[in-house]
Regions:
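Short, solvent-exposed loop/turn positions at domain surfaces
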Residues: 43-45, 90-96
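Hydrophobic alpha-helical targeting segments used for export or membrane insertion
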Residues: 2-13
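Short glycine/threonine/proline-enriched tight-turn/helix- or strand-capping micro-motif at secondary-structure
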Residues: 20-52
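Acidic, glycine-rich catalytic/binding loops that coordinate metals and/or anionic ligands
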Residues: 13, 42, 97-103, 112-113, ...
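Zn2+-dependent peptidoglycan hydrolase active-site motif and core
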Residues: 51-92, 113-118
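Short, well-structured beta-strand-loop connectors
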Residues: 48-58, 95-111
Length: 169
């Protein structure tokens, strides 16, 4: 008997801004209990905010005086149709509208202070479940390799981008 296994990988999320995480995700004890359902980045006002993933914008608008952009990831990213990724706390660029496709790293607006990043898993017939996006953020790491001694100087190892999670696979 031959067994085949398929390893599905997901594309890492690009941090929407280039600052460290200021506030971590805090899992609420119940569906409607208090908790921090986003990770937040402290960012100077007016700095560019980038799309964390390629996909179709399903919402671009203001909620309680803050701009939010929700992206349904493209099929090639590995996330599937049940995942939505939202960036909040920004002033949205005029060309960022619902139904438009964005590329990873494309500017979607400018910071209005604290930038929020959230992930939701939506299953048919069930409430949306928030997921900690931290494990999906891309991290730079050097590739380890052995270099034989040849008397010449060593070459630098390439830097790879990795994320430790795969979404439910």
């Amino acid at each position: 008997m031959i067994v085949f296994s398929l390893l599905l990988t997901v594309q890492c999320l690009l941090a929407p801004v280039q600052t460290p995480v200021a506030f971590q995700y805090v899992e609420p004890p119940c569906e409607y209990c208090a908790g921090r359902r986003t990770i937040d980045f402290a960012q100077s006002v007016g700095q560019s905010v980038l799309a964390p993933i390629a996909g179709r914008i399903t919402f671009a608008g203001t909620v309680v005086d803050q701009g939010y952009v929700t992206i349904d990831p493209s099929p090639g990213t590995g996330y599937g149709p049940e995942v939505l990724i939202t960036v909040g706390g920004l002033v949205i660029d005029a060309n960022i509208v619902s139904g438009r496709n964005v590329q990873v790293g494309e500017r979607i607006g400018v910071s209005n202070g604290l930038i929020h990043l959230s992930m939701r898993s939506i299953r048919e017939g069930k409430s949306a479940r928030y997921v900690d996006p931290t494990a999906y953020l891309g991290r730079r790491r050097p590739r380890v390799r052995l270099i034989p001694y040849s008397g010449f100087g060593a070459r630098r190892a390439q830097i790879g981008l990795t994320c430790p999670a795969s979404f439910g696979r």
